[in-house]
Amino acid sequence: MAVVTGIAAAGFTFSGATPALAEYEIEESRVEKGEAEIEYRGAVHFGIKKGEDDDDGDGDDEVGGVFEEDEEAPLRQSHDFEFEYGITERFKLSTSLITGEPITDSYGVDGVEIEFLYELIEREGEGWGLAAGGGYGFGVRNGEADEIEFGLITEYQTGLLLLIFNGLFEGQVGDNAETDGLGFGYGWRAEYEVVPHWGIGVEMFGEIEDLSHSGPWEEQEHSIGPTIFWKPGDDDDDEDEFDLDEDFVPGGPAEMELTFNVGVQFGLTDETSDSALKFQGKLEF
């Protein structure tokens, strides 16, 4: 069976910042009425923002001292939890709890997101899919601004190759807003099914905090790296697939499916963490 879109949820921010919105997400355009999804996303960062390191090169013991009071500190780790539900055949809502540990503070809740997705073009098998999405993120940690986001999710599949691109405009709102203009964040994935249930791919994420003052490439956040995908319930014709259907659960949901991926991201600029190990898991029912 051709490869199916991977882990998804609406909106994303990227390595190196203390986000009110979630980290390392790539959204798929598919919406199915009555389908619920529970998702976990996590990331562990290695190497602080190179542009913020001190000059003695000895590392990370006193990293917190190099940041201004109003400056976002990079993350050591993040753990996000999301629930999605398809309201109609075209429209779904989701809510997320965003948690993390910046290098200047202890682990805690960073924000809460409420998001929507509307499917404009349904992809059936190969071809194009298109959806519009948006959301509002409530900053919970001290000094964090609320954020709004809106944009398009595009995907294209040919054979065993799946391409997904997310482009979202982002803006800060509320008393803690530090920028007046819109920012832009993106994430793209190229995924290829190597054998049934297993795929490999490349993902890239980036963010321009303020389009009106974008600055040079090195002052933006960009990262890229490989990802491995495992979808034990991806093949409806496989007798060993890890699905539960109505034959096994009378009166229950038509299908239950698990998907996972693990990847590594490498920072391309001084403003991005050196590397990050990212992992995602999703249960659909």
Question: Which ranges hold each PLM region?
Answer:
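Low-complexity intrinsically disordered segments
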Residues: 2, 10, 23-26
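C-terminal segment of classical bacterial N-terminal signal peptides
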Residues: 5-19
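Transmembrane beta-barrel domains of Gram-negative outer membranes and organellar outer membranes
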Residues: 18-285
